[in-house]
Amino acid sequence: MATTTTEATKTSSTNGEDQKQSQNLRHQEVGHKSLLQSDDLYQYILETSVYPREPESMKELREVTAKHPWNIMTTSADEGQFLNMLIKLVNAKNTMEIGVYTGYSLLATALALPEDGKILAMDVNRENYELGLPIIEKAGVAHKIDFREGPALPVLDEIVADEKNHGTYDFIFVDADKDNYINYHKRLIDLVKIGGVIGYDNTLWNGSVVAPPDAPMRKYVRYYRDFVLELNKALAADPRIEICMLPVGDGITICRRIS
């Protein structure tokens, strides 16, 4: 049956409203910890495979961290589980973590390491680390951690300066100041062994990497967005590594050094 002018106008108007609504949805403030579009699906993942297997110490630290005003900085529970398994899969023993916060990912790493495993952990804020330290100590893994308070770059420069340290790290996790990720990578690529892994957190950065330029964002999200985009391009073009970007937590890029 032929469509009348009025019906066509209504259809056009409806389509226009649908497009506007879709555009408005895309312009909502970005800031969800999980990048899954379905909260129910994410909750299903947590309740089915994450929380039932989460060590009691990690659960306790997660709950303590949830009360902290900057709790959004913590590693998500599903990402903690992923890191724990990844470290076991690569048989990591000598590791490094840049950016600790209260230590959730640090604890996930320490629990996965063998008894003589080591973590060089760096963060500018010892107070946050000490919030989780009693739980880490109770879990019996504090002896694996060498915590250094202060900016990571000077420490890395000192380590890189000694060629004996080159290629000695099995696994490195970075969840720190995004504006220095490129600077970290330039140093870490020499420190991780061939076949070793570097994990960069927040590489999808609240989904902002695909947000329109005029999308409402929190100031810190907008500020660091370009640095994350720069890192992602650099990693994709780096012939010394194989990469895999995963939508776990806020996005994590796994880099395996091949040369």
Curated annotation (Swiss-Prot):
Q: Which cofactor does it need?
A: a divalent metal cation
In-chain residues carrying the UniProt-annotated modification N-acetylalanine: 2
List of residues binding S-adenosyl-L-methionine? 75, 97, 99-100, 105, 123, 152, 177
UniProt-annotated binding residues for a divalent metal cation? 175, 201-202
GO terms of molecular function: caffeoyl-CoA O-methyltransferase activity; metal ion binding
The pathway it acts in is:
Aromatic compound metabolism; phenylpropanoid biosynthesis
Which tissues is it found in, per the record?
Answer: Expressed in stems and roots. Detected in leaves, siliques, flower buds, flowers. Expressed in the tapetum, but not in the endothecium. Detected in the vascular system of leaves and all flower organs, including stigma, stamens, petals and sepals.
Q: Where is the composition biased (Low complexity)?
A: 1-14
GO cellular component terms listed in the entry, alphabetical order: cytosol; plasma membrane
Region labeled Disordered — which residues? 1-29
This protein's UniProt keywords = Acetylation, Lignin biosynthesis, Metal-binding, Methyltransferase, S-adenosyl-L-methionine, Transferase
Regarding protein family, the annotation reads:
Belongs to the class I-like SAM-binding methyltransferase superfamily. Cation-dependent O-methyltransferase family. CCoAMT subfamily.
Q: Describe its function.
A: Methylates caffeoyl-CoA to feruloyl-CoA. Has a very low activity with caffeic acid and esculetin. Involved in scopoletin biosynthesis in roots.
Q: What is this protein called?
A: Caffeoyl-CoA O-methyltransferase 1
**Organism of this sequence:** Arabidopsis thaliana
Q: What is the lineage of its organism?
A: Eukaryota, Viridiplantae, Streptophyta, Embryophyta, Tracheophyta
